[in-house]
Amino acid sequence: MRTHILLFIEGETEEVLFPAIIQYYRSNYNCQEVEFHYKNLRGIGNYKSKAKGILQETINKVKKGNGILKVVICSYDSDVFDYSHNPPIDWKLLKKKLEDITKAKNIVLMPSIQSIEDWLLSDMEGLCNYLKAKKPRNLPGKNGHEKIKHLFKLYNKVYYKGYDSENIVAR
């Protein structure tokens, strides 16, 4: 019986990064027996409206193939909620609703504390190689996204969140 994992993501950059990370682990640690399903909900608000239906659909598909859905991971940017008195999603309630569908306690909430651009900045050498640029002394900006936009602008380029991150990760 093949093991399946469903990973909910909320944006284009995650759609590029998570498969690359999993491919890295598969090729380096012999993790071929697990099948991953990525579902881009295209925004945090769609966790409420789409996640339950997609989960049920995935469970049915996995059962048809004699597999088992072991884990559901909900990845989201936590910075959206940092200063909100009334956050748009009650994550505990969503987790409970998803657990009711799976009949198990295998729902993992995975808030991203830093943006994916912050991860990309941790490989400044690779980023500069991609741009064919020299490593800057410092980058202004309050977060990784602003810093990468500034770096691209220094070299007369525009940073496109999904597209450029895919090319950067591929290198």
Q: Where do the model's predicted regions map?
A:
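C-terminal accessory helical subdomains adjacent to catalytic cores in phosphodiester-
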Residues: 1-4, 15-41, 52-171
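Extended, compositionally biased accessory segments flanking or bridging domains
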Residues: 9-15
